[in-house]
């Protein structure tokens, strides 16, 4: 079939990573992006972390895309479901088509859209509901085996979340919004075979698919787990599953700990290195590459770098992550908003200077460091626009982050004794050819470099549960 080029004009809210999310959806459908222009500047498509900028400022994005099929309207319809999109215009069969959606909503649920009827479950397939709560959103998707038949992101109003009080008290609000969307899509809960929830800050566990039990629910309600909205994933999953008499699971939560003993030791007794990283996405992408290479993940030696608002680089040896930088506690490369590893004595001096509280220092390390501290933004799309417009300091900062990622990959190559089958770059920042190119230039002598831009944690959740339902993997017990 002859390839053809279509031009699409999007109006989108100025959100972090908006270009990357749009580009990811288009590429996922089998189209190639030939040109992408935003705000009259040609910039690479890069994705950052989820988040909504204050106000309703918009950008006009012009894309030329090339593909071998004629399903562009369906692709654009799915892109219109992204909360960042205000309108889409395109030419279809010689006719200009314009689709709009309201700029904002004050409700916790998404702007009302025409109900999309979910197709009936195929005979012999497994239907899995996957739930991934974020700080101000709840993402969910419905899968028939590996096929996504419904996916939504519910944006919650910050003021309404605040009225709930404690984070765990948001459960009813988020659950009810999710159930409302399922009902609007005519999904019968009785058609679902299992529910997967994003696991929170549980006790350290090995990688796997874990059946949610009373002990896990107790820990998900603990003070530590309640620090992050991901705890609500397991709680809501268990509640929905319990009402239907079906199993609920979590898959590879951030606390997966398979580190070698000598990787945990530090030079200060009483302070050990912890394994807190993007386990779900790292493991899922590693399995995907292993399948492409025709090699079981359990027989592979990979280095996986998750590149996003947080950056973690893991050494995967025969199915286990034997070393990885702690993406929260200040290890590894600096990131769009985290400091990464920094000299300790100057930090001690800052802590005892009397200028900062403990909370302020933690904020500086985890949310106001890295690129944001240097350039005032954590949005790498904006940083690349600065570089494109000739900002030499912005180029230095971005290239320094790539340098530090490369150095961390080199460290993990040493952990694997130089025997590396492949290096994987994934996460939102992997959409940037400039950023991944700078890393490749330094590390491609260690092993072939494979780039998997973006992440699909909902698919990873569903995929883990599907392996259990098919009998390919046994569920672990917490």
Predicted region positions:
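A conserved regulatory-domain signal marking ACT and ACT-like small-molecule sensing domains
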Residues: 1-110, 115, 204
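Glycine-rich phosphate-binding loop plus the immediately following alpha-helix
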Residues: 231-239, 250, 265-301, 310, ...
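N-terminal phosphate-binding loop and adjacent alpha-helix
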Residues: 150-188, 216, 220-225
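Glycine-rich phosphate-binding/hydrolytic loop that grips phosphoryl groups
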Residues: 430-431, 437, 450-478
């Amino acid at each position: 079939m002859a390839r053809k080029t279509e031009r699409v004009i999007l109006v989108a809210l100025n959100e972090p990573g908006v270009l990357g999310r749009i580009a990811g959806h288009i590429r996922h459908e089998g189209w190639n992006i030939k040109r992408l222009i935003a705000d009259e500047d040609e910039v690479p498509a890069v994705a950052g972390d989820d988040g909504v900028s204050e106000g309703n400022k918009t950008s006009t994005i012009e894309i030329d895309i090339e593909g071998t099929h004629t399903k562009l309207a369906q692709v654009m319809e799915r892109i219109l479901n992204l909360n960042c999109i205000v309108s889409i215009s395109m030419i279809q069969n010689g006719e200009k088509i314009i689709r709009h959606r309201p700029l904002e909503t004050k409700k916790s649920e998404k702007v009302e859209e025409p109900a999309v009827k979910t197709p009936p479950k195929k005979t012999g397939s497994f239907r899995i509901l996957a739930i991934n709560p974020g700080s101000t959103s709840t993402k969910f998707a419905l899968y028939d085996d590996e096929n996504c038949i419904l996916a939504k992101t519910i944006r919650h109003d910050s003021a309404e979340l605040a009225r709930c009080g404690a984070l765990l008290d948001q459960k009813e609000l988020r659950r009810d919004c999710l159930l409302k969307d399922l009902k609007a899509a005519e999904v019968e809960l009785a058609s679902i075979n299992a529910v997967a929830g994003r696991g929170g800050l549980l006790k350290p566990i090995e990688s796997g698919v874990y059946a949610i039990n009373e002990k896990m629910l107790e820990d998900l309600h603990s003070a530590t787990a309640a620090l992050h909205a991901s705890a609500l994933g397991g709680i809501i999953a268990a509640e929905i599953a319990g009402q239907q008499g079906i199993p609920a699971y979590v898959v590879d939560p951030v606390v997966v700990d398979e580190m070698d003993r000598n990787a945990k030791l530090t030079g200060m007794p009483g302070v050990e290195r912890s394994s807190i990283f993007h386990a779900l996405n790292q493991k899922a992408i590693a399995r995907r590459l292993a399948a492409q290479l025709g090699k079981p993940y359990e027989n592979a030696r990979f280095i996986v770098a998750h590149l996003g608002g947080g950056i973690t680089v893991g050494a995967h040896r025969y199915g286990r992550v034997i070393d990885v930088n702690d993406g929260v506690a200040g290890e590894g490369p600096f990131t769009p908003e985290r400091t990464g590893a920094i000299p300790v004595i100057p930090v001690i001096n800052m802590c005892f200077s009397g200028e900062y509280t403990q909370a302020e220092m933690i904020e500086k390390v985890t949310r106001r460091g890295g690129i944001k501290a240097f350039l005032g933004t954590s949005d790498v799309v904006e940083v690349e626009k600065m570089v494109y417009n000739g900002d030499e300091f912005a180029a230095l900062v971005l290239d320094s982050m790539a340098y530090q990622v490369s150095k961390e990959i080199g460290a993990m190559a040493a952990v694997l004794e130089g025997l590396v089958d492949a290096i994987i770059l994934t996460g939102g920042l992997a959409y940037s050819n400039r950023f991944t190119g700078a890393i490749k230039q330094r590390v491609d002598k260690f092993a072939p470099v494979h780039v998997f831009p973006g992440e699909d944690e909902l698919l990873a959740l569903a995929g883990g549960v599907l392996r259990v339902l098919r009998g390919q993997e046994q569920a672990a017990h917490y």
